[in-house]
Amino acid sequence: MSETSEDLLRNVAKSLTNERFKLILFPTEQCNFRCLYCYENYQLPKMSNKIVESIKLFLDKRIPTLKLFELEWFGGEPLLEKRIVIEISKHAKLLCEKYNVVFHSIMTTNGYLLDIETFKELNSIGIKSYQITFDGDRENHNQFRLLANSKIGSFDKIWDNMLEIKNHCELDCVITIRCHLTSVNKASVQSLLKRIQDTFSKDNRFFIHLKEISALGGQDDDKIQHISREMKQIVVEELKNEYKELSFVDIGKDYVCYAAKPNCFLIRANGTIGKCTVALDSEINNVGRLLQDGTIEMDKEKYLSWFQGFDNLDKEILDCPYYALKRKGKF
């Protein structure tokens, strides 16, 4: 058995065990940004108090059965509803402490509202990992990641927030800086990586993830000059070799997507249960709903359809079940 297949089987085993569970929550589907390539429609408001209480009741039932619980915050921009994030996170953390369950918490945020006091508060309730995106250097980033209310750029505020964390906070955390690649922005990304290397390379809490901008259904997808998979691989290797002082992370070729895993699902701001954070408007992604008493009502046929990659360990489906199954005509 090759090392690669052992890694894949290990990831598959983690995906199938009932002792691990990952929950992705959308405290709101509103956002303070209007990124050029975003696929979301911002129609749903924040979670109601009833939905929040139902999530807490669900966690009361689920966490005692686990050895590891992972809570991920998504959106929209989750920090627009910091109160909800804090309320549910505190509840989950206390339950995990009570039942001796390992607790990991992650947030995907644009970073604009992640000031030093917010960072410290979130760290105290167990949120210690963040993904923050830049679209190249200041000039390029500010063309793509605009504020919703003024259409001005966001680079300086996000950068200043990260500097505050680096310079004035020694709390343990992992901050993954996601750098977006297109077919024409290599020089801009080089400029950004040079700036990151000069500023953050000696702080081992900061990591770099190089990721292409994908065509995910945004209304301005046609304005993005997307990079091919082959060219992306070449550019990534060149950048890694050029900026050796930075710590780069990659998902690996034996990656199993969260949406392919039976022990992971998401709850949207209205209590709808889904599998994929991208295919939000797809009917196949509407797999169930959260009931008021904290129980889950699932459409078993839809829910099980996401796990077809495990039938024969099809790596294409395990890597991205939504698009792979669409291409195969199974969605």
For each feature predicted by the language model, list its residue ranges.
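Short, charged low-complexity linear segments at domain edges
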Residues: S2-R20, L239-E245, I251, L290-L304
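Conserved alpha-helical substructure of the radical SAM core
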Residues: E3-K120, I125-K128
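Short, solvent-exposed loop/turn segments at secondary-structure junctions
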Residues: Q30, P78, Y112-L113, D137, ...
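Short cysteine clusters
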Residues: C31, C35-C38, C257, G271, ...
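Buried hydrophobic side chains on well-structured beta-strands
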Residues: L71-W73, M107, I132, I177, ...
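Radical SAM enzyme [4Fe-4S]-AdoMet core and its adjacent flexible, acidic
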Residues: D135, E139-P262, A269-N270
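Active-site and channel-lining beta-strand-loop segments
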Residues: P262-L280
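Flexible mid-to-C-terminal extensions adjoining Fe-S/redox cofactors in radical SAM and related proteins
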Residues: T277-F331
